[in-house]
UniProtKB/Swiss-Prot annotation:
Name this protein carries in UniProt: Transcriptional regulator DauR
Family the UniProt entry places it in: Belongs to the DauR family.
Organism superkingdom: Bacteria
TM stretches of this protein: none
Higher taxonomy: Bacteria, Pseudomonadati, Pseudomonadota, Gammaproteobacteria, Pseudomonadales
Length: 210
């Protein structure tokens, strides 16, 4: 803290440092002193402003302004990168505006990553499943049925009980899933159970139907 800085704002400077550290290097936090209308503190300076610069936040001192959080809103940084910001009005014990804490997050990197993901995951790049490849794809049919069964019951594959697995084996059998040559072994691996247990359930089903 410099000699000209108000010690009453020191806690807010520490908060600014904490936020900037958490989101480093993508976030700048600026503390404006509304009484002096000057920039009091900057953590992780991205905007090239300086402590002591004019804040131009006189409107924040108007008596009828009761806003606490303003934003998020967007602005453009000096280097052309997009910034998303939120400003919080800090008040004293009497409820009077004392300072404004502005968090400025550089979202250009995240937007570039999103654009790359959107391009990579775009459904327009997909073609329908080729019949020649999927006509006899018993693994695909098992996977589709399995996860539909789990969704209906709001279950996770890693949380299945023995009884759940037994019910699922029987349901897969009813769906004709075990017509594939290696289907029993595949189901055993997916459900994390012994192949002998799968055959046991199938045998019980067959004996029960006799």
């Amino acid at each position: 803290m410099s000699p000209s800085q108000d010690p009453s704002l020191e806690n807010y400077r520490a908060i600014a440092d904490g936020i900037a550290t958490l989101f480093f290097p993508h976030a700048e936090v600026v503390l404006h002193d509304l009484r002096s209308q000057r920039v009091d503190y900057i953590a992780n300076n991205l905007s090239k402003r300086e402590v002591g610069d004019d804040s131009a936040l006189e409107d924040m001192l108007e008596g009828d302004s009761d806003e606490r959080n303003i934003g998020p809103y967007e602005k453009l940084n000096w280097d052309g990168q997009k910034i998303r910001s939120v400003s919080t009005v800090l008040r004293d014990s009497a409820g009077q505006p004392l300072a404004v804490l502005c968090i400025n997050l550089n979202i250009s990197l995240f937007e570039s990553a999103k654009a790359a993901l959107d391009l990579f995951l775009s459904p327009s790049k997909l073609i329908p499943q080729p019949d020649a490849l999927f006509r006899d794809d018993w693994q695909e049919r098992i996977n589709t049925f399995l996860h539909g069964w789990l969704r209906q019951r709001q279950l996770g594959l890693n949380l299945l009980t023995r009884e759940h697995k037994r019910e699922l084996v029987l349901a897969l059998h009813a769906e004709g899933a075990f017509k594939g040559k290696s289907a029993a072994n595949y189901v055993a691996n997916v459900l994390n159970m012994g192949r002998a247990t799968v055959y046991k359930h199938l045998k019980e089903l067959k004996e029960g139907g006799d």
